[in-house]
Curated annotation (Swiss-Prot):
SUPFAM superfamilies in UniProt: P-loop containing nucleoside triphosphate hydrolases
UniProt superkingdom: Viruses
Tagged with keyword Transit peptide: no
Record's protein name: Putative replication factor C small subunit L499
Organism of provenance: Acanthamoeba polyphaga mimivirus
This protein's UniProt keywords: ATP-binding, DNA replication, Nucleotide-binding
One Pfam short name: AAA
Family: Belongs to the activator 1 small subunits family. RfcS subfamily.
An example Gene Ontology biological process: DNA repair
Its job: Part of the RFC clamp loader complex which loads the PCNA sliding clamp onto DNA.
Length: 344
């Protein structure tokens, strides 16, 4: 069954589902990214040699969808009896391993399941395991070792460096990359067609740009903009409603910063006021402004040492924003950074 036939055949009230769930792949062949990983997993499933798995990579790259599709492939309609899914960011302590996981792996399969299904290993899916405490990871390693004969574990995280090395060594690790723009464009265009969303071509490109390979973020943004606008979506709608900066506006801010000179005190004050006006009128957050400025700085004519100085101090400026320093003061700090760089 094709991806779109699967979506059409689902029986739940689809209009009430968030699009990110409504259009989540249901079969392993429906996943559009990381094809090398998909091929490897299909071979494991076909040969019944699925190892413990560790999926890592950025958000929205298909990690959770992939293992759920694998589970459907293995268990079919009995999936709810054979898997335990936990989010480790909510249940990050050692008690989770002691109780929920141990109880699941030690329990016998339901007598109502067919013999062929009862003989298959169970599956524990642990999402966001990089949020788990060190102690909990240590106990999880022991649980995996003791129950390898009856249970497989799939550990999912964004940051593999936060995972116990001993735990990593017991799993087949797969790095998920952000989705490429072509795949994202195709899926978003198809969703627009199925939902009757009218849009300008550049609007989809803008969603892809601000999502940075995160398919979940892209679909959520598309649905959000569509709900607010209700008509044909354009690029300005996407940036305004998602809270991101229009490229032209960020370029205007950068041009002001690039021209700053520490010897022109009046010019500095006026320039900062101009930037404050732009940021306020366009409802731009400091975080998003800095994110876009990073990209422009990296493509600019600044020397390598100047770029390093600015990017390093952008990170410190983001910290000020995170502790609620007044945004006008942050913009003054930002201007002073460029004054310094322009006169080094």
């Amino acid at each position: 069954m094709s991806y779109y036939e699967t979506i059409a055949s689902r029986t739940e009230p689809k209009k009430q589902l968030p699009w990110v769930e409504k259009y989540r792949p249901q079969e392993i062949d429906h996943i559009i990214s990381n094809r090398d990983i998909i091929l490897s997993l299909k071979k494991f499933i076909e040969s019944r040699t699925l190892p413990h798995l560790l999926f890592f990579g950025p958000s929205g790259s298909g990690k959770t969808s992939t293992i759920k599709c694998c589970a459907r492939e293995i268990y079919g309609k009995y999936i709810n009896y054979m898997i335990l899914e936990l989010n480790a960011s909510n249940e990050r302590g050692i008690e989770t391993v002691r109780t929920k996981i141990k109880n699941f792996v030690s329990s016998k399969s339901s007598i109502f399941l067919p013999m062929g299904v009862r003989d298959i290993f169970k599956l524990v899916i642990l999402d966001e395991i990089d949020s788990m405490t060190v102690e909990a990871q240590g106990m999880l390693r022991q649980t995996i070792e003791k129950n390898s004969g009856t249970t497989r574990f799939c550990l999912i995280c964004n940051d593999i460096d936060k995972i116990n090395i001993a735990l990593q060594s017991r799993c087949a690790s797969f790095r998920f990359s952000p989705l490429n723009e072509l795949d994202m464009h195709g899926r978003l265009s198809d969703i627009c067609r199925l939902e009757g969303v009218k849009y300008e071509k550049e609007a989809i490109n803008s969603i892809i740009k601000i999502s940075k390979g995160d398919m979940r973020s892209a679909i959520n943004t598309l649905q959000h903009v569509n709900l607010v606008i209700g008509g044909s979506i354009n690029t300005e709608d996407v940036y305004k409603i998602s809270g991101h900066c229009m490229p032209e506006i960020v370029t205007d801010v950068f041009d002001i910063l690039f021209s700053l000179n520490k010897n022109k005190t009046k010019s500095l004050k006026k320039s900062v006021n101009d930037i404050i006006t732009i940021v306020t009128e366009n409802n731009i957050t400091i975080f998003n402004l800095l994110e876009e400025l990073k990209n422009i700085v990296m493509e600019s004519k600044f020397t390598t040492s100047q770029k390093i100085f600015l990017i390093d101090n952008f990170a410190k400026t983001e910290m000020y924003d995170s502790v609620n320093v007044d945004s006008n003061n942050i913009l003054m700090i930002l201007a002073c950074l460029f004054v310094f760089v322009n006169n080094v």
